[in-house]
A protein has these predicted regions:
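Active-site-proximal loop/turn and secondary-structure-junction residues that shape catalytic pockets
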Residues: 3-4, 38, 67-71, 100, ...
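Aromatic- and acidic-residue-enriched carbohydrate-binding clefts of CAZyme catalytic domains
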Residues: 5-58, 71-88
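Hydrophobic faces of well-ordered beta-strands that scaffold small-molecule active sites
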Residues: 1, 63-65, 94, 117-119
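Conserved alpha/beta catalytic core and glycan-binding cleft of carbohydrate-active enzymes
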Residues: 107-180
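Secondary-structure transition/capping motifs at alpha-helix termini
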Residues: 55-64, 86-92, 108-114
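Structural recognition of alpha->loop->beta junctions
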Residues: 84-94, 137, 144-148
């Protein structure tokens, strides 16, 4: 049934950009604290975004935002952006893009303990003590190895079974895995 089909809404970068562009997807530096005006039907995009999140939550759907942070964005600023969207708009999690994302800083921030963070990799040694298993697994790694391994397997490429099975069975103790 449809009630069971959707469990989260993932938004592309939804921050306002410095200069309006056509066919712009938001993968450049922008105004990270301001919802994109063109996504709004009113003159109050922040209120409209909050209302959307509230409606989605009432229907059992989490809100995951995607943010791209270029290398020159400071670590403390990234933390403030994430905290703003969690506490001001009640966003449930983030798909983070960029090269130098301070994942350990975000993952160890007590105020973000229930916030889902998706990234390409996490240095669990910096986040957890020894082999601690978190009570709430809020970190997830995007695994594109799965996509390539399964493609090779589906084409019946030589030696493709073990990599495909390895990708399917991958289940680290401290993070989740999102296969795509």
């Amino acid at each position: 049934s449809m009630e069971d089909a959707v469990n989260h809404y993932r938004d592309l970068p939804a921050g306002e950009e410095e200069a309006p562009r056509i066919n712009y997807w938001g993968y450049k530096k922008g105004y990270y604290f301001a919802p994109k005006m063109s996504y709004s039907s009113s003159d109050c995009p922040a209120e409209e975004f909050k209302d959307m999140v509230k409606q989605l939550h009432q229907n059992g759907i989490e809100v995951i935002m995607q943010f791209y942070f270029p290398v020159d964005v400071k670590r403390a600023y990234i933390l403030e952006v994430i905290k703003y969207w969690v506490f001001s708009c009640h966003v449930d999690g983030f798909h983070l893009l960029g090269v130098h994302i301070p994942t350990a800083l975000l993952a160890t921030e007590p105020m973000l303990g229930n916030t889902k963070l998706f990234y390409t990799d996490f240095s669990c040694d910096e986040i957890y003590d020894n082999s601690d298993i978190p009570a709430y697994k809020n970190l997830a790694v995007y695994n594109d190895d799965f996509m390539y391994a399964v493609r090779h397997f589906l084409k019946s490429d030589e030696g493709s079974l073990l990599p495909a099975l390895g990708s399917l069975r991958k289940n680290p103790r401290q993070t989740g895995v999102i296969n795509y």
